[in-house]
Amino acid sequence: MKNQLIDRLTRYTTIDTQSDPKSTTTPSTEKQWDLLHLLEKELQQLGLPTDLDENGYLFATLESNIDADVPTVGFLAHVDTSPDFNASNVKPQIIENYDGKPYKLGNTKRVLDPKVFPELNSLVGHTLMVTDGTSLLGADDKAGIVEIMEAICYLQEHPEIKHGTIRIGFTPDEEIGRGPHKFDVDRFNADFAYTMDGSQYGELQYESFNAAEAVITCHGVNVHPGSAKNAMVNAIRLGEQFDSLLPDSEVPERTEGYEGFYHLMNFEGTVEKATLQYIIRDHDKKQFELRKKRILEIRDDINAHFENYPVKVDISDQYFNMAEKILPLPHIIDIPKRVFAKLDIPANTEPIRGGTDGSQLSFMGLPTPNIFTGCGNFHGPYEYASIDVMEKAVQVIIGIVEDTAENN
């Protein structure tokens, strides 16, 4: 199977599908259609009925091969790649039997070094796909697409493996947070699903952050500095004051595990107007609400010293902890746990310090945990994929549909 995985991942990663947060269309970029149309053709060649809508959501069905009434399970992956780094002219490189030593990426000065990326130490002996140092790889999430496609191929070649109806979904714009925005849960028509969008071997994730964005706008009064006493209000300094009133220890670089944070993403402005953009994250719903409340309290504390209330706050929720919707349905987690145990894969159920499409889909009526893909260092030139771990991910998909049919 390794050769098929390498061939398919190479073909998919060399197609530029970078999304664009500034775009208002869905998909956000025309080039995502290139991969969507290819996948549609390949699924049809496998004999699967497909449904590609005007927003770039590609669904397909592998029909049940048993008479029993068993749940319909779905598998999802996203076609877009991150806008954080160059995604064009991707030139995948193969490392056979990785020796655990630093590896120079193409003709660049970039080096994939286990001292910097210690997770590489667990991949000694693996076949790796890496970049040439000039682009990201796009294994996030084309590895997930490959794993789903190869699992479907395997199931068709092995009709002795009994399974219920399987739904497949390839979606746009996950990297810019819009993946589920136009996802039609009713049209997808699965009882539950799994995103193949994790990272390290053994990840089985069903807890995510609660997430919000806060935009703080500070309005100043610009007066000639020579006569500014008791008249000037410097919006930049108001922004600095606002940020200083947030807990210094509750930032991404000083938190881990279940610890939440405030993250100042952008701060720009002039004396007259300054804007601060934060993301707010916490796994605990009560703490999440308290964090948003603290933002409003700081606004009020600063505004109390002025007559014209110069600080404005706009908070918008982005997604919520999917555990709230998944934990009441324990079979959705028990199924992959049994499969992991059967395959001798140690399950890592640590919470996601982020979100997936499943975070939103779970609240839209489709409970959707996340499973490892075997890739790492996403969104940059050090991205890699372990073909060996990808092979395990394919086995997990096959095991999930088999277990669902057996245990109903």
UniProtKB/Swiss-Prot annotation:
EC number annotated for this UniProt entry: 3.4.11.4
Binding annotation for Zn(2+) 2: 140, 175, 379
Main location: cytoplasm
GO cellular component: cytosol
Classification via PROSITE patterns: ARGE_DAPE_CPG2_1, ARGE_DAPE_CPG2_2
Listed InterPro entries: ArgE/DapE_CS, Bact_exopeptidase_dim_dom, Peptidase_M20, Peptidase_M20_dimer, Peptidase_M20B
Keywords, sorted A to Z: Aminopeptidase, Cytoplasm, Hydrolase, Metal-binding, Metalloprotease, Protease, Zinc
Record: active site: 80, 174
Keyword GTP-binding assigned: no
Compartment(s) of residence: Cytoplasm
Superkingdom of this protein's organism: Bacteria
Entry binding sites for Zn(2+) 1: 78, 140, 197
GO molecular-function term, one example from the UniProt record: tripeptide aminopeptidase activity
GO biological process, one term: proteolysis
Cofactor: Zn(2+)
UniProt catalytic activity: Release of the N-terminal residue from a tripeptide
CC cofactor note: Binds 2 Zn(2+) ions per subunit.
Pfam assignment, any one: Peptidase_M20
Group of enzyme by EC: hydrolase
NCBIfam families xref list: peptidase-T (TIGR01882), PRK05469.1 (NF003976), PRK13381.1 (NF009920)
Similarity section: Belongs to the peptidase M20B family.
Function according to Swiss-Prot or TrEMBL: Cleaves the N-terminal amino acid of tripeptides.
This protein's name: Peptidase T
Organism: Staphylococcus aureus (strain MRSA252)
Encoding gene (name): pepT
